Amino acid sequence: MKPWLLLVLLCAAAPASARTAFQARCEDTIGQSVSVMSSKQNGYRIDNSYSFHGLSAMKGERAPGSYVLGLTRTESQVRIGIQGRMLSDPATGYECVAPRLEVHMTYLPIVVYVGREFRPGTCAYREILAHELRHRDIYLNALPRAEKVVSDALARRFQGKPLYAPGGQARNLLQREIDTGWMPFIKREMEKVERLQAAIDTPREYARLGKVCAGEVQSLIRPAKSKRTT
């Protein structure tokens, strides 16, 4: 995070007996820095409208000659709102702010795709769906973990103390810290889920899916390979 904020926060964290009059007024009247976390699970739906050719195109990069039989997709979203009281000190030319950060993290509704070549109720459909539901569960479980990591990091950073800056700069510098530090940090934390997703899609798992149900999967995709419809 930004060095100026770190320095003035350390000054603000000095023992109460060493506080300046301005520090005492700030800490005693404008309240504490607060981070309010919220997250929302938006559920999931199953979509059987795409062919495996369409799903392969949707996924994009993949191993040569491979096909995508099912796919699970969502998108992370982060919003950070800033409020808080401020005081100015004409004698020192400094100001203090007790920020209230409201952080909202969510994934858009998860869409679980299964190629339309695989009819619901068949063995192949059940196997492909079971594989994709593992991906769904990773997304559902990732959100509370990411929320805790972010909450702990914010608590360490702000320590419930006001922040100090030269007059007229506190809000802009705080916004800059949010934009260039916290927003990228939170997005990276939410994107870590993709490494867990990749760990499911191993060559061994793909080979297993190709052989399940007495070869039903291969028997369904073989005649469809030449059609290439979405």
Predicted regions and their residues:
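Catalytic Zn2+-binding segment of zinc metalloproteases
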Residues: 133-150
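N-terminal signal peptide c-region/cleavage motif recognized by signal peptidases
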Residues: 13-15
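Family-specific functional microsites
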Residues: 148, 155-156
